[in-house]
C-alpha cells in the first residue's frame, strides 16, 4: 500500500498513460473483458486476492474532469465491474473504488474503477 501512495504522490495528470498502452495492446495485460467502450483486466499489483480494473477506452484523466456526457460511460464501468466480479466468483461481496488525485491515491491519470474482493474488506479503507 505504501508503494501505491508513493506512486500517487509523483503521478501527474495529462499525457499518455500505461492504460492507453494497454488499450492499444502495446503492452500485455490479463484481460477479463473488453467491449467498444471499456476494458477490464487484472491489476499488476493486487491489493486483494481478486483485484481488477475497469477502464474506459475514452481518455478521462480523473473523475473531477468528467462531464455530463460521460454519465453513461461511467455507469457502464460499474455494470461491467459487477459482471466481471460475478464471473470471477466474488459471491460474498467486493469493493469498487475510484481514486481521485494525489491525496486520493490516484497513481494513473486515466480514470479507472478498482474492484477488489476475495477477502473481508476493512473500514475505513485508508
UniProtKB/Swiss-Prot annotation:
Enzyme class: hydrolase
Annotated compartments: Cytoplasm; Nucleus
Catalytic activity: adenosine 5'-phosphoramidate + H2O = AMP + NH4(+)
Positions of disulphide bridges: none
Result of altering residue 112 to N: Reduced interaction with SUMO2
Changes seen on gene knockout: No visible phenotype. Mice display increased susceptibility to carcinogens.
Enzyme Commission number(s): 3.9.1.-, 3.4.22.-
The entry's keywords: Acetylation, Apoptosis, Cytoplasm, Hydrolase, Nucleotide-binding, Nucleus, Phosphoprotein, Protease, Thiol protease, Transcription, Transcription regulation, Ubl conjugation pathway
Binding site for AMP: 43-44, 99, 105-107, 112-114
A GO-annotated cellular component: cytoplasm
Consequence of substituting residue 116 to Q: Significanly reduced interaction with SUMO2
Known regulation of activity: Desumoylase activity is inhibited by zinc ions, and inhibition is released by nitric oxide or calcium-activated calmodulin.
GO biological process, one term: positive regulation of calcium-mediated signaling
Phenotypic consequence of residue 84 to S: Loss of desumoylase activity
Active site residues of this protein: 112
Alphabetical list of SUPFAM superfamilies matching this protein: HIT-like
Domain HIT: 18-126
Phosphoserine modified-residue sites: 45, 72
Motif (Histidine triad motif): 110-114
InterPro entries given in the database record: Histidine_triad_CS (IPR019808), Histidine_triad_HIT (IPR001310), HIT-like (IPR011146), HIT-like_sf (IPR036265)
Entry function: Exhibits adenosine 5'-monophosphoramidase activity, hydrolyzing purine nucleotide phosphoramidates with a single phosphate group such as adenosine 5'monophosphoramidate (AMP-NH2) to yield AMP and NH2. Hydrolyzes adenosine 5'monophosphomorpholidate (AMP-morpholidate) and guanosine 5'monophosphomorpholidate (GMP-morpholidate). Hydrolyzes lysyl-AMP (AMP-N-epsilon-(N-alpha-acetyl lysine methyl ester)) generated by lysine tRNA ligase, as well as Met-AMP, His-AMP and Asp-AMP, lysyl-GMP (GMP-N-epsilon-(N-alpha-acetyl lysine methyl ester)) and AMP-N-alanine methyl ester.
Subunit field text: Homodimer. Interacts with CDK7. Interacts with RUVBL1 and RUVBL2 and is associated with the LEF1/TCF1-CTNNB1 complex and with a KAT5 histone acetyltransferase complex. Identified in a complex with MITF and CTNNB1. Interacts with CDC34 and RBX1, and is part of a SCF (SKP2-CUL1-F-box protein) E3 ubiquitin-protein ligase complex. Interacts with SUMO1, SUMO2 and RGS17. Interacts with the Ten-1 ICD form of TENM1. Interacts with CALM1; interaction increases in the presence of calcium ions.
Family, similarity comment: Belongs to the HINT family.
Name recorded for this polypeptide: Adenosine 5'-monophosphoramidase HINT1
Organism from which the protein derives: Mus musculus
Amino acid at each position: 500500500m505504501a508503494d501505491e501512495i508513493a506512486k500517487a504522490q509523483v503521478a501527474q495528470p495529462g499525457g499518455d498513460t500505461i492504460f492507453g498502452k494497454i488499450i492499444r495492446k502495446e503492452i500485455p495485460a490479463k484481460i477479463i473483458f473488453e467491449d467498444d467502450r471499456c476494458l477490464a483486466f487484472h491489476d499488476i499489483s493486487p491489493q486483494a486476492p481478486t483485484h481488477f480494473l475497469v477502464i474506459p477506452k475514452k481518455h478521462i484523466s480523473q473523475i473531477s474532469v468528467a462531464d455530463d456526457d460521460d454519465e453513461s460511460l461511467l455507469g457502464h464501468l460499474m455494470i461491467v465491474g459487477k459482471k466481471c466480479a460475478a464471473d470471477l466468483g466474488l459471491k460474498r461481496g467486493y469493493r469498487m473504488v475510484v481514486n481521485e488525485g494525489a491525496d486520493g491515491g490516484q497513481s494513473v491519470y486515466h480514470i479507472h474503477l478498482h474492484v477488489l474482493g476475495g477477502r473481508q474488506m476493512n473500514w475505513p479503507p485508508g
